């Protein structure tokens, strides 16, 4: 039997092991847990939140302020004629007045400012959750391309070893030059695929770094796409709709608009101004007390338009809550069905397709040793295995994307970050 085909067979069989031994330990490793921590600490959008909180807190302090009293001085009957010559007949009035707010205006301002702070807090939580989900999505994209590059590197080494063996056999006249050309073309295709994957890997890595203020360069991204936790039942996911981030924000906005309606109604009520002071008559050398009372005549509600607008805003939010509940239920059902479809594909690839591809390689190796098939047919069998592994990586990546979308919608943790 020819020893050269046996050498090629041995190389094809031993290559994955040699590949694993050749890998060096990465020096700069990034984990998903660290990536999420980087987002919490360095994301510019999250860093702006404390300033928004300080602004709203200051506005609440402003809302709690009551009107200041007003001091007035009045002089009359001076620099006139006859008895009002010069200041001989002048009258002086020193008075103090105070605006008294009616309709609980001050308390309604405080309630509205408090509702704004709570809405801002919920909005921050939703923004934080969305950014963490985006971080995880981009991290798993990096993991996917990292795994595909490793798989393609394994494939390239296999093709190179086969090319070397075929070139030696071609020199001996055992195979045609067309077989050598075809193998070189296959190697070029692998190189092209590697370049494309490297470009996508770099793009996904830079997209992950966009979330952080400081650039974090890593040699290796830790994680195993095949480790996917069991998803909760569809009923359990539907039960948490009322606590979903978007729904919680709408509920707080409803409370916010309710407080605004109360404020607009109280603003439509007239306020009372009371005043009192002392009056001195220069001509008679007499002093007396004065008292004043004033209130606008409420012929019409001066704030009627704002009240009506606030009522319509409440009705709109109430309608949006109902629509959002229906929309979330539909999205969760769709994603849940899609997840199970992809899970079935992953199981088929793991339990049937890949094992059958491995069996095909063993049978092809045996047939090649017996001279029944060409080396190109043997490599086709090897390509089938790599295609199956690539499909499994892509399927696992899609499963993670579905889980992260469900996390974003429900606010429930579905992925264990410590696994990486």
Model-predicted segments: where are they?
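Acidic, low-complexity, intrinsically disordered peripheral segments
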Residues: 3, 23-25, 33, 393-420
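Gram-negative bacterial Sec-dependent N-terminal signal peptides
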Residues: 1-21
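Bacterial Sec-pathway N-terminal export signals of envelope proteins
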Residues: 20-70, 75, 99-100, 108, ...
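Small/polar, glycine/serine/threonine/aspartate-rich low-complexity segments that form flexible
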Residues: 23-28, 72-109, 221-230, 273-308, ...
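Short, charged, amphipathic alpha-helical segments
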Residues: 110-114, 177-186, 375-383
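Periplasmic alpha-helical coiled-coil/stalk elements that build and connect Gram-negative outer-membrane
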Residues: 2-5, 127-243, 335-338, 342
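Amphipathic alpha-helical coiled-coil segments
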Residues: 48-60, 127, 131-152, 161, ...
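A glycine-/polar-enriched beta->alpha junction
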Residues: 37-47, 54-68, 83, 94-111, ...
